[in-house]
Amino acid sequence: LENGEIIPYTKAIVAPGIDFKYDKGYIEGSEAYAPHAYKAGEQTVLLSEQLQNMKDGGTFVMVAPNNPFRCPPGPYERVSLVAHYLKHNKPNSKIIILDQKNKFSKQGLFQEGWEKLYKDMIDWRSVEFGGKVISVNPKTKVIKTDDGDVIADVLNYIPEQKAGKLAFDSGLVDGDWCPINTKTFESKLVKNVYVIGDACIAGPMPKSGFSANSQGKIAALQISRILVDLPLVNPPKLAN
């Protein structure tokens, strides 16, 4: 632990969470100018303050990451909240989404709502059609894309993601994420350690709170049976 205490275990369940892949000019410290605000706290407040200080007629630009990442609908829920605020407070403003993929979670529902409520305020650009980010300057808020430069008044840059530091420090990672046995959630790399939540590779399960909750229950159930020499159960099918 951080205080130096060592806790012995027979089985351990860990949820390392996520960390960010800094590249394309978005380096550690860039959050002071272009917050990702994808971990709640100071950056959330900063992004809110930047929006409040933005002029009417300004441009809010979000760079949405490629899959996989925490909470797939999250960026688009945020865009909806920003659009609501701008419509009622800075109605001449514009939102541009530079998406590093060609489709996103619940896309039809989001775009139907945006068209109904915000008309031309929101401009979503897929990676194939003008959204691909080549580089970014967080201080000047200039984003270079394969279709030219985009200049933001407020830049919300959400980097691509990887498993949290604990996972890397513990040898649980292959590539960016933690491979697991999907029947038990035991790590494929470290015996008797079970990885749940956003850090694990759990097939088609999204990196969501519901998924993490369900994974924890399955891991606990299987561990309880292993410890008393009972056979494993087949986990139920889950829907999110």
Question: What are these model-predicted stretches?
Answer:
Residues A199-A239:
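A conserved FAD-binding loop/helix module that cradles the flavin
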Residues D23-G25, C71-P73, Q107, L166-F168, ...:
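Short glycine-/acidic-enriched loop or helix-start segments at secondary-structure transitions
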Residues L1-R70, G74-E77, H84-H88, N156:
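FAD-binding core/adjacent interface of flavoenzyme oxidoreductases
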Residues G29-D56, V150-S214:
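FAD-site-proximal beta/loop scaffold in flavoenzymes
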Residues L1, I7, H84-D176, P231-V233:
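A Rossmann-like FAD-binding core segment of flavoenzymes
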Residues N66-K90, C178, S187-V195, P204, ...:
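Active-site substrate-recognition segment that forms the wall
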Residues P65, Q100-N102, D198:
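Cofactor-binding loop segments of dinucleotide-utilizing enzymes, especially the Rossmann-like FAD-
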Residues T59, N92-I96, N192:
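Residues at the starts of beta-strands that form the adenosine-phosphate
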